[in-house]
Amino acid sequence: MYRAPSAHDAHPGGVVSAVKYRGLELDVCRRRSTWRALMASSILAVVLVFNAATAGPPLWQQRAEQRDGLSAAEFSRLVRDLSEEGGYFRSDNFTSNETSYLHIVSKLREVGTTGGAYIGVGPEQNFTYIAKVRPRIAFLIDIRRQAIIQHLMYKAIFHLASSRWEYLSLLLSRPLPKDKALSADASVIDILSFFSKALADDRAYASNLAAIRKAIKEDFQIQLSDTDQSSLDYVYKSFRDEGLDIAYRMEGSRGGWFPSLKELIEQTDQYGKLGNFLATKDDYEFVRDLHRKNLVIPVVGDFAGKKALAAIGDYLRKGGFTVAAFYTSNVEQYLFQNGVFPSFAENVRKLPITEKSLFIRAVPNTRFTHPAQLPGHRITTLLQQLNVFLKDFDEGRYQTYTDLVMTHYIAPASPQ
């Protein structure tokens, strides 16, 4: 926690009386000057260390790179320098568990939330929001180091896969037929039908994993520790073993139902329209292009931590970006439980925003039913303006998570 200086922090010799003998007085002044110089040097050193994470190339070079993409060296630096120490969460987020994730897409379009910067948390649902918001740059922040390794795996697959067919083939270790032409414009339902029947192949798995490791090490210039390698093996093997049936896992869930990857891809908005990033060639290619430009940057960080989110905000501000959308899932629920929500709000305050900057929240309908819940969904996805959030926070409106999700939210459009 930051603490404002108080009177007790003042130097006990802050006011020094004049000394009778000029020589002694001069010595005191010299000592005070030396002490001040040392203090100034110490403060400067602290500032330099704090700014090191976002210093990078000069501003003009950063903006040029952001148009054309970041170099591998700069991508690697950002992943490394913006990240905090990893933390623990009791789930394997192989996939999202939010079937309502498309319900706010029409509202995003209506508000005009597009371009700028996207910030998100969690696995593949971010790719759909990126496809809809069309940001110039994206940061994916997660407290679990394994989640960042999973995103590096995704990034490698995007680099290697020129089509949606190839993406799912690499992700699931299901080889594509060599004697059959596959249409780049095929419906996602047809693509899913093929992979629902395809069998995993151990040779493809080994070859693909080697290619993914090589891309992470050589193309992205990320050095994986032994623990990171084990995490990559675990995640990629899980996709091989479970295929399109893979789903979110939580310790102690007692076999509770979570949607499979296939079911998530098949989800529609409230008007019956498919919208996953794999639903159209155009959306897939946008997300792939952003990855290939090294502009989807995974960062290990705590929303309420002292470094990652604030450093992302500093980087965006220096680069001339404003936040278009910040997808928080239901992380804020845990921030309230852990008593650190105010620290998160202060981190949000450090982000460059406009009146169009929006939160995307996923609210579980477990302890109460949200008024905006749509039939057939256990999650309600909502929007909120970031500037409204900060105003409400300053007015003390958010004493509980329920207060947060029930105050000044933007509900999904009604299907009627």
Predicted features, each with a name:
Residues 136-297, 392-416:
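Class I S-adenosyl-L-methionine-dependent methyltransferase module
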